[in-house]
Amino acid sequence: MGYQLFEFENLEDCHKALIERFKEFFNAALKKHHQVSVAFSGGRSPISLLQKLSVLDLKWHECLISLVDERIIEASHEDSNAKLLHDYLLQNNALKASFTPLLPEKISGDTNELLDFANQHFKQPHLAILGMGTDGHTASLFPETSAFLNEEKENIVLTKPTNAPYERLSMSINALENCEKLFLSISGVEKRGVLEKALKENAPYSLPIARILHSKKVTTEVFYAKN
């Protein structure tokens, strides 16, 4: 358990390695489970990776795609993670995959209803691909929300970050640790510094990503690009 760190000089080489591991995991999980469930993170950073994954020659029709986290906004909004996946991943060969959103088509003002919907439709992913912010957040588990410190029984939790826009739904620490594998993709000197800080932390953790990297239940493969 814990983590494995793979370092690369540039993002292109980093993505190549991650994609190779993705293919290996995908095919092994398909053989084991007869279906593969993968959760993806949002944000702008993974766009080029999503595009590269979309053209892979895999049995996408046997794949269920879901979200690690989502902002509580309409699916048509530019900041929607569901829109991000539809625009950049669920294209080309990956168009054959099934997609399960975290939010219903019509969003009510009752966040408890939205949370219930997300948990009722949740399917445990075999793999989750994560990113990390310069504040050490991952998924939508932010340092100031303390949700990452809780052993939530729910698979999806509501978070209300004070340093980022929108209320959000996010996979809980429990759900992330129940994955068979986690991939973390980061780049740049600043995020390397955050990673180093997280690796040195001891419980109770101040950084959400540290909680993941020191997990005794799941291994995180960290793909780091210097540039």
UniProtKB/Swiss-Prot annotation:
Keyword Disulfide bond: no
Enzyme Commission number(s): 3.1.1.31
Protein name: 6-phosphogluconolactonase
GO biological process: carbohydrate metabolic process; pentose-phosphate shunt
Family membership noted in the UniProt record: Belongs to the glucosamine/galactosamine-6-phosphate isomerase family. 6-phosphogluconolactonase subfamily.
A Pfam family reported for this protein in Swiss-Prot or TrEMBL: Glucosamine_iso
Record SUPFAM superfamilies: NagB/RpiA/CoA transferase-like (SSF100950)
Biological role stated in the UniProt entry: Hydrolysis of 6-phosphogluconolactone to 6-phosphogluconate.
Catalytic activity: 6-phospho-D-glucono-1,5-lactone + H2O = 6-phospho-D-gluconate + H(+)
Pathway involvement of the protein, from the record: Carbohydrate degradation; pentose phosphate pathway; D-ribulose 5-phosphate from D-glucose 6-phosphate (oxidative stage): step 2/3
Matches recorded under InterPro entries: 6-phosphogluconolactonase_DevB, Glc/Gal-6P_isomerase, NagB/RpiA_transferase-like, PGLS
Keywords recorded for this protein, A-Z: Hydrolase
CDD domains for this protein: 6PGL
Domain of life: Bacteria
Species for this entry: Helicobacter pylori (strain J99 / ATCC 700824) (Campylobacter pylori J99)
Keyword Hydrolase applies: yes
Gene Ontology MF annotations: 6-phosphogluconolactonase activity
